[in-house]
UniProtKB/Swiss-Prot annotation:
It comes from Chaetomium thermophilum (strain DSM 1495 / CBS 144.50 / IMI 039719). The gene is ELYS. Belongs to the ELYS family. Its main location: nucleus. GO terms for biological process: mRNA transport; protein transport. Required for the assembly of a functional nuclear pore complex (NPC). The nuclear pore complex (NPC) constitutes the exclusive means of nucleocytoplasmic transport. NPCs allow the passive diffusion of ions and small molecules and the active, nuclear transport receptor-mediated bidirectional transport of macromolecules such as proteins, RNAs, ribonucleoparticles (RNPs), and ribosomal subunits across the nuclear envelope. This is Protein ELYS. The keyword Protein transport applies. It is found in: Nucleus, Nuclear pore complex. The keyword Transport applies. InterPro entries: ELYS_dom (IPR025151).
Amino acid sequence: MLDFTHFPEVFPTDGPRPYDQHFVRQTETFRKSLDGVLFIDRVLGALGLPDAAKAYPPRGDAGLRALHQQVCSAKVSAHAKLSVLYYLLLDHDEHRGSRSQLADALAEEVGLPANYQILMRGLWHMDRKEFKFALEHLAHPSLPAEFADEIITVLVRDGHTTGDYSLPLAYYHAVRPVLQTSSALENLFAALARTSVTDALAFSRTYPDHGARQLLFERLVASVLEEHGSGQVAGRSASRAKELVSLPLTGVEEKWLNDYLSTGEGRKSRSAKAVVQMRQVVTGRQKELGAVVGVRAGR
């Protein structure tokens, strides 16, 4: 059986090598665009490697040998170590062309379980911002929700740039991860709110905590006001505003809406008054208010 701690048994000693200056510059560009952290950095950090961002990408053959030694010396399972080596061989395969299958050959030789391969290939694509390819692997039913918060955050931020939130929502609906950080939850909810007001409301109702629900509800309203007030894509913003005012709200949610638009942060929006009036029309309250005014005027 292959001894993965022996460098020449893992990495080719001849042929083209990926870790030249161009690769390093390209990787640093990807790292910068991903808020300074690649997914392989997180994996190496989980192995206990100090300053993972300096370990990858390795600089030349000497750097690769040093990284290999660090990985093999880590106090983690063999599968965890092999996962990193698999990732590094994906770099080699990409550099050598489509016929190169060094990563898969290693996995077969050492019996690396398929779910480890799927995860690392998905993270490899994430680090190259090939998000559609990444999700083909990361949404696989055999995988636990590893790095779910970070994956959601990266995909939503990309959605802010493209205006398309289909990828983070596809990942969320496929994996159904329990998000651990408030920032990841906020990013997911932002994607939901910009895609479907109704779905975002339903999501907010899954939270038993009253305060958390109110906060999410107010963020939903804020996202509609922001788009409606900025004049972004008039047809879409009008449709979202109509969807908001037509929601079947509970009594508590109705109060949250009124309070947010009349005395809360929402009152600062140029669209607040219009949304209040639209809601009154939809719920019939405008007629009720008109009748009250008529009675008071003696009509």
